[in-house]
């Protein structure tokens, strides 16, 4: 894991000192710059930046919400007999912590998707949802979304992250042993895979620098460029973002927590959208992690 539990803690202890240096450099040399973070553990990285330089203009971007919007679009196509539903047309209210984020509302062109999602789960819980021509066992990052489905049945909201991340927050249920992981049909990224992936990336970087390979400019599905355009005043964008809860966008979490909600991006401005309260059950699941973030940061 890279967010919660022992794996998240160790990664945080490695990463926080580097983010202290980054925050100090921004404070000293570019205090008015916008800082976009994509590094995990997301909440702690953003929290460190603000801890060192409270006036920093920083936010964290994560694509897990996009993946859940895509899942809802695909389920809606199957259940409603529609085609070509764009991920961007799935309107959601986002609230939670990064990688433990939830939707309490989701719709497509005015159609409430909660009943649609519920019906799909009732009829496909055991096999889950597998994308076309993609066997979950063949991919490190694949999942059949059964953890999401189980959490929906337990708590009534849509968990909006990959199953391998959601499982980090509830290890006794989903990470008990390899057999348990296999039964929930999600993959884990191993140390061996990470090392091999890094090797491939470094080799590719060398080829790009030498000119042996050309840079291919293709859309990645991330929204970073759109957000930069909005901050430059060229457009207005609403997207999910990780920033401190200082505006009380989630009232029943501490204002010191870094939370994930929607926000409005416009010229030199990020305005968090009021997301509302978490249910008490889900809040109790999150509070230990909020407290852990405080402890990890202050123990450095």
Task: Say what each PLM segment does.
Residues 80-300:
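Long, compositionally biased stretches enriched for glycine and/or charged residues
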Residues 7-14, 33-37, 56, 60, ...:
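Conserved aromatic-histidine-acidic binding/catalytic patches
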Residues 2-4, 25-26, 49-51, 274-276:
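A short alpha-helix capping/helix-coil boundary motif
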Residues 1-32:
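Rossmann-like NAD(P)-binding element
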Residues 21, 25, 48, 67, ...:
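Alpha-helical scaffold segments in soluble metabolic enzymes
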Residues 25-34, 51-57:
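Short, surface-exposed connector motifs at secondary-structure boundaries
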Residues 13-16, 20, 39-43, 62, ...:
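Conserved structured core elements
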Residues 38-109, 114:
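Rossmann-fold dinucleotide-binding core
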């Amino acid at each position: 894991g890279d967010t919660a539990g022992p794996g998240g803690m160790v990664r945080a202890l490695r990463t926080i000192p580097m983010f202290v240096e980054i925050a100090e450099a921004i404070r000293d040399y570019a205090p008015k710059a916008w800082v976009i973070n994509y590094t995990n553990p997301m909440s702690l990285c953003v929290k460190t930046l603000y801890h060192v330089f409270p006036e920093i203009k920083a936010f964290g971007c994560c694509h897990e919400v996009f993946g859940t919007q895509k899942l809802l679009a695909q389920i809606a196509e199957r259940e409603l007999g529609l085609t070509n539903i764009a991920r961007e047309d799935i309107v959601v209210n986002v609230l939670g912590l990064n990688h433990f984020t939830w939707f309490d509302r989701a719709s497509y062109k005015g159609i409430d998707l909660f009943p649609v999602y519920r019906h799909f789960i009732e009829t496909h819980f055991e096999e889950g949802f597998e994308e076309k021509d993609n066997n979950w066992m063949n991919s490190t990052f694949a999942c059949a979304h059964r953890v999401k489905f189980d959490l929906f049945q337990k708590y009534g909201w849509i968990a909006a992250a990959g199953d391998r991340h959601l499982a980090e927050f509830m290890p006794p249920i989903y990470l008990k042993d390899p057999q348990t992981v296999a039964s929930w049909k999600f993959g884990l990224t191993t140390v061996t895979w990470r090392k091999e992936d890094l090797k491939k990336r470094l080799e590719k970087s060398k080829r790009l620098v030498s000119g042996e390979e050309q840079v291919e400019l293709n859309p990645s599905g991330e929204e970073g460029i759109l957000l930069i355009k909005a901050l430059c005043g060229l457009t207005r964008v609403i997207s999910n973002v990780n920033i401190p809860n200082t505006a009380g966008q989630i009232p029943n979490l501490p204002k010191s927590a870094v939370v994930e909600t929607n926000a409005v991006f416009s010229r030199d401005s990020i305005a968090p959208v009021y997301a509302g309260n978490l249910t008490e059950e889900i809040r109790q699941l999150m509070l230990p992690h909020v407290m852990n973030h405080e402890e990890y940061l202050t123990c450095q």
